Amino acid sequence: MADCVIRDWQGKEAGKATLDLKVAKETTANDLMHRAVLRQQAHARQGTASTLTRSEVRGGGRKPYKQKGTGRARQGSIRTPLRPGGGIVFGPKPRTYNLAMNRKERRLALRTALMARVEDVTVVKDFGTSLEAPKTKEITDALGRLGIAADAKVLIVLTEPSDVVRRSVRNLEKVKLIAANQLNVFDLLHANALVLGEDALATIQEVYGDD
């Protein structure tokens, strides 16, 4: 269980919230989160890289020159891997990089990652609701008021990010905005600072706090 300070859009304290999630044992936590990150990165790979073997390359059916009498090494095809334009030996073929991890482990890894970063969490009440039009400076100023460094990698988690907030954030290279139902281990561990909307915190507690 961890207590989080709730701040308003101006960075002033506006209350407190509690995050109570079941986490993995200390002896297995690092391994569990590591496997979850590996799985997420592996699933992001397309696995479509493909090369042609000597049997698949077009041409090469005719013997390039006679077997004997030329003084050169014997050759049976111009598509041998020894020649330019020939087939590839042991090259990549389409494959799946998917790694298996059951649902219970995935949820436990996510809860463990979030609780491990709880000291870097800032809960904000009504994040961005006062924005009338997309304005990047409003977001950077708000993050500054929350005490987040300008060069920090920031993950903002909202229940239903508005279009205004999305457009205000998209030009910030080190700021990533995701919905609460898109929460993942990699983003939680990769960011230097986590900004959660008050409603997003409630959603996370509701969805992941029942195990």
From Swiss-Prot:
Sorted UniProt keywords: Ribonucleoprotein, Ribosomal protein, RNA-binding, rRNA-binding
- Stretch list, region Disordered: 41-87
One GO cellular component from the entry? ribonucleoprotein complex
Entry annotated with the keyword Cytoplasm: no
* Basic residues bias (residue ranges): 60-71
| Pfam families from the UniProt entry | Ribosomal_L4
Q: Which domain of life is it from?
A: Bacteria
User: What InterPro entries does the record point to?
Assistant: Ribosomal_uL4, Ribosomal_uL4-like, Ribosomal_uL4_dom_sf
An example of a GO molecular function for this protein is: structural constituent of ribosome
Q: Name one GO biological process term.
A: translation
State whether keyword Ubl conjugation applies.
no
Q: Which Gene3D superfamilies match?
A: 3.40.1370.10
> What is the annotated quaternary arrangement, including any partners?
Part of the 50S ribosomal subunit.
Q: State the family it belongs to.
A: Belongs to the universal ribosomal protein uL4 family.
Function per UniProt = One of the primary rRNA binding proteins, this protein initially binds near the 5'-end of the 23S rRNA. It is important during the early stages of 50S assembly. It makes multiple contacts with different domains of the 23S rRNA in the assembled 50S subunit and ribosome. Forms part of the polypeptide exit tunnel.
Under NCBIfam families, the record lists:
rplD_bact
Protein name from the UniProt record: Large ribosomal subunit protein uL4
Organism name: Parasynechococcus marenigrum (strain WH8102)
Name of the encoding gene? rplD
